[in-house]
A protein has these predicted regions:
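N-terminal [4Fe-4S]-dependent radical SAM core
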Residues: 1-33, 43, 75, 248-260, ...
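Disulfide-bonded cysteines in secreted/extracellular proteins and peptides
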Residues: 7-9, 40, 44-47, 272-275, ...
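Pocket-edge positions in alpha/beta enzyme catalytic cores
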Residues: 24, 58-61, 86, 111, ...
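Canonical Radical SAM [4Fe-4S] cluster-binding loop centered on the CxxxCxxC motif
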Residues: 25-64
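Glycine-centered loop/turn positions within well-structured domains
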Residues: 42, 143-144, 270, 296
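Radical SAM/AdoMet-radical enzyme domain recognition
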Residues: 63-83, 90-205
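Radical SAM enzyme [4Fe-4S]-AdoMet core and its adjacent flexible, acidic
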Residues: 144, 152-262, 266, 300-302
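Flexible mid-to-C-terminal extensions adjoining Fe-S/redox cofactors in radical SAM and related proteins
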Residues: 270-277, 281-347
């Protein structure tokens, strides 16, 4: 083989390796969910055990390792990255990771899901580093109830201040609320009014069975349909076109009020058919689907001298094996007792 032909062959191999990342059902990965840490300063019952056992620090990927995987995925067509945890802001200097990711040419947005506790100090730094939006988990608008849900005292006002500070520095803010029957389902209209008053998007999430405290049951699930009926009785809604691959169906208020309502119906109406996400856990596991028990350990390659092509092959193999969806699991209740609680997967 001549040198020229060898180069052409190498270029062709490179082109194939970094082609769009497709699974066996034709779904193309465009979004990365990156868990920065499994640690969190809150103890929400649907996410975190009361007495969690943290991953050893030496098992957690460095920012450079996370950045390298993100760069490889960007070459394979991923354009949007969302940082999660645990709580991403408990990890020191996380704005350095934000800057690394936002500097990747192919990446269009770097956003973060956070409990908001550290936003009063961090919002400005995150914005300057290139963060393009935050989603704040806010599971009650009643201070005492909120603090009971998160298992921490005197934190509600600080979270609300964090939302204000993020907006002050120009970070678009969405609010996530997990609705649980008998806990906060009487606040659905209060959250709708929050959206109307502030112009924010409030996203109602169905209660999923990845709870660290094993409290999930079908009876506690409030469906997206029930949430929408409750809101529509007081504030009629108009559905907006759903973006392909979106986890949420978004609605505007029919009377033209500010703000939007969204529902994420992972349990009653999964969006698996056009799911475009791939997940990387803080300890380096590729998780093709939130509900899947299959994990593919990337850390040995990252720390064993593997080149980008080898890592790309590994990722392609893992993503190819993504299963069709959660319908079968939902029908047979195989999702109960998931191997990982939510704080170790990244929401």
């Amino acid at each position: 083989v001549t040198k020229t032909n060898a180069c052409l062959c190498d270029e062709r191999t490179d082109e194939l390796l970094f082609a769009p990342l497709v699974d066996r059902f034709g779904r193309v990965a465009k979004k990365l969910r990156l868990s920065v840490t499994d640690r969190c300063n809150f103890r929400c019952h649907f996410c975190m055990p009361l007495n969690p056992v943290w991953l050893p620090k030496e098992q957690i990927l460095t920012y450079e390792e996370m950045g390298r995987v993100a760069q490889i995925l960007a070459r394979m067509g991923v354009t949007k990255i969302r940082l999660s945890g645990g709580e991403p802001l408990v990890r020191r200097d996380v704005e350095r990771l934000v800057a690394m990711l936002s500097a990747i040419p192919e990446v269009e947005s770097v956003t973060m899901t956070t409990n908001g506790f550290f936003l009063p100090e961090m919002a400005e730094r995150l914005k300057k580093a290139g963060l393009t939006g935050v989603t704040v988990s806010l599971h009650s608008l009643k201070p005492d109830r909120f603090e009971g849900i998160v298992g921490r005292k005197e934190v509600f006002d600080r979270v609300m201040a964090g939302i204000q500070k993020a907006r002050q520095f120009g970070l678009p803010v969405k609010v996530n609320v997990v609705i649980t029957r008998g806990c906060n389902d009487d606040e659905i209209l209060d959250f709708a009014e929050l959206a109307r008053r502030t112009g924010m998007t409030v996203r109602f999430i169905e209660y999923m069975p990845f709870d660290g405290q094993k409290l999930w049951s079908p009876e506690r699930l409030v469906s997206g349909d029930e949430i929408l009926r409750t809101i529509n009785r007081h504030f009629p809604l108009v559905a907006l076109p759903r973006e392909p691959g979106s986890t949420a169906q978004v609605y505007r208020f029919a009377d033209g009020a500010l703000g939007e309502i969204a529902v994420i119906t992972s349990m009653t109406m999964p969006f698996c058919h056009d799911c475009d996400r791939i997940r990387l856990t803080a300890d380096g596991k590729i998780v093709p689907c939130l509900f899947s028990k299959d994990e593919y350990d990337l850390r040995p390659l990252l720390r064993g001298g593997a080149d980008d092509a080898t890592i790309a092959r590994f990722i392609r193999h893992a993503f190819w094996r993504k299963f069709s969806g959660v319908a079968t699991l939902l029908e047979t209740a195989q999702y109960v007792g998931h191997v990982r609680p939510m704080h170790t997967i990244g929401g």
